[in-house]
Regions:
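Hydrophobic transmembrane alpha-helices of multi-pass small-molecule transporters
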Residues: 67-70, 114, 182-186, 212-216, ...
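Short runs within selected transmembrane alpha-helices of multi-pass transporters and secretion channels
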Residues: 76, 144-163, 171-179, 200-215, ...
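N-terminal transmembrane alpha-helices
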Residues: 12-50, 63-78, 82, 107-114, ...
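Interfacial/gating helices of multi-pass transporter permease domains
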Residues: 46-66, 132-137, 197-198, 240-247, ...
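Small-residue-rich hydrophobic transmembrane alpha-helices
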Residues: 55-115, 152-171, 279-343, 376-398
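Helix-terminus/linker motif at the lipid-water interface of multi-pass membrane proteins
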Residues: 37-56, 125-132, 188-195, 256-285, ...
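Transmembrane helical elements of multi-pass membrane transporters/channels
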Residues: 23-42, 144, 155, 178, ...
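Short alpha-helical transmembrane segments in multi-pass integral membrane proteins
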Residues: 1-25, 83-148, 192-249, 305-372, ...
């Protein structure tokens, strides 16, 4: 493939919108399901082969790993927006400069975040008042996950680049390979070698590293037009770095700001005891799995909007928004019905049936959150559309609203209503985010359509 080739087969500016969105979202969904299988394998193996105490230890780290890992993920995936806009507009020189400056940005994120988080992990757990009987295991798990952040950055930067091209199939294939490795390595290190929670953490980061390396090799071989052809394209460019930071940092902050609310929530869940922590942990794993299709649709929509924004096809952006929301709402109704009738069976994936209290907490959480999926479909559709147009900074406002919602429920309701309030948290949080991001999308879309056409 020559450097000037436009890769028309990955363009989203022409053709049937629903088919494009679903064909792109399909591999992304599979990749996200595989990513969740990572987490489910860890939790299921730890819960079934170690103990509910070990599961609680892993669960006690979830909000911390969420805020740190998702800051890195959001920051790295953010490169897909300026890259997709340059690609959609046919500006390959700009595309190469965004790519190389994105590499510099990702390296800085990896080094800084690893050094800070790994050295402060014990202090973080102390601030969260992690129960003493699970503190040691939680600390071991957290340190290993944080030391593996460079591998998380590698995979998600490559994922962001592939999303810019509308190429979601290969990254999914690589994730499938690493997921199989993760499950077998999990079983080997936890069950055979007896490394405990440390084995689960090592399996996770090693396997993600495999996906990252495979993705990087694939990009190097297929997308030759990304790589600089002269010294000017290889050097640091303040203009391109500024645009990358303007897009990537808000996305990273939006993910992490939302997670700050989750940390406050985790603080109050920890106060409810070991059984509540284990139930919340297993319920949250299932929730993340159920929400994968909505995330995949949002990711597809972001790339779709980015390319069509670059091509000034606002008619397709509007139609893409409507089609994505319709699909999301249909899916939400289906999952609500499924969760109500199969919640107990889902809980038994993680928890022994003899742990009746933990099973009860898990089932209650699953059934509650399934009611709120329709809200999340609207939230994701609006948020990913705003990000695709290159205005990720406004996602921070939505993230702040969600953070405030989580914090308010945790502080005001959990002390009085206990675990029930933990379950209500999701719905109230989503409503807060919608109240902010939906008006922003409508105003932005109308303004940009008038000014650019």
């Amino acid at each position: 493939m020559s450097r000037t080739e436009t890769l028309d087969n990955t363009k989203m500016t022409n053709g049937p919108i629903t088919r494009i969105l679903l064909s792109f979202a399909g591999p992304v969904l599979l990749g996200q399901l595989l990513q969740q299988l990572y987490n489910i394998a860890d939790a299921a193996i730890v819960g079934q082969f170690l103990s509910s105490k070990a599961l609680a230890a892993v669960g006690a780290t979830s909000s911390l790993t969420y805020i740190v890992c998702y800051f890195c993920i959001g920051s790295c995936i953010g490169i897909s927006v300026p890259a997709s806009q340059a690609f959609g507009a046919g500006k390959n020189t700009d595309l190469r400069k965004y790519f190389i400056n994105g590499v510099y940005f990702a390296l800085a994120i990896a080094v800084i975040m690893t050094a800070v988080t790994a050295s402060m992990s014990g202090l973080f757990l102390t601030w969260l008042k992690t129960p003493e009987n699970i503190f040691k295991d939680a600390h071991v798990y957290l340190v290993i996950i944080f030391l593996g952040l460079p591998l998380t950055v590698l995979y998600n930067f490559c994922f962001g680049i592939l999303m810019a091209f509308g190429d979601s199939k290969k990254s999914t294939m690589f994730m499938a390979v690493s997921t199989v490795i993760n499950i077998f390595l999990d079983l080997f290190l936890v069950v055979v070698v007896k490394w405990g929670v440390a084995g689960a953490a090592v399996a996770t980061i090693f396997s993600q590293g495999i996906a990252g390396v495979l993705s990087a090799v694939y990009i190097f071989k297929k997308y030759k037009l990304l790589f600089p052809v002269n010294a000017d394209e290889r050097k640091f460019h303040p203009y391109y770095m500024k645009n990358i930071i303007k897009m990537c940092m808000p996305m990273g902050l939006q993910y992490s700001i939302t997670a700050i609310g989750a940390i406050i929530l985790q603080f109050y869940v920890n106060a409810l005891g070991e059984d509540a922590i284990a139930g919340f942990t297993s319920g949250y794993k299932i929730k993340n799995l159920i929400l994968c299709p909505l995330n995949a649709l949002g990711t597809a929509l972001s790339s779709f909007v980015g390319q069509n924004f670059g091509a000034k096809r606002f008619d397709r952006i509007s139609e893409g928004f409507k089609r994505t929301l319709e699909i999301g709402l249909i899916y939400s109704v289906i999952t609500m019905i499924v969760c109500f009738f199969t919640g107990r069976y889902m809980a038994l994936i993680f928890v022994d049936a003899a742990d009746t209290v933990v099973v009860g907490y898990t089932v209650k959480f699953i059934r509650y959150i399934s009611v709120f999926n329709a809200e999340l479909a609207l939230l994701f559709t609006a948020r990913y559309s705003v990000q695709g147009m290159g205005y990720g900074k406004y996602s921070i406002l939505s993230g702040l609203a969600e953070m405030a919602g989580r914090a308010a429920v945790a502080v005001l309701l959990i002390p009085h209503f206990g675990f029930d309030a933990v379950c209500w948290n999701e719905g109230l949080t989503f409503l807060a985010g919608i109240a902010v991001i939906l008006p922003i999308y409508i105003k932005l879309f109308c303004h940009l359509r008038k000014s650019m056409i």
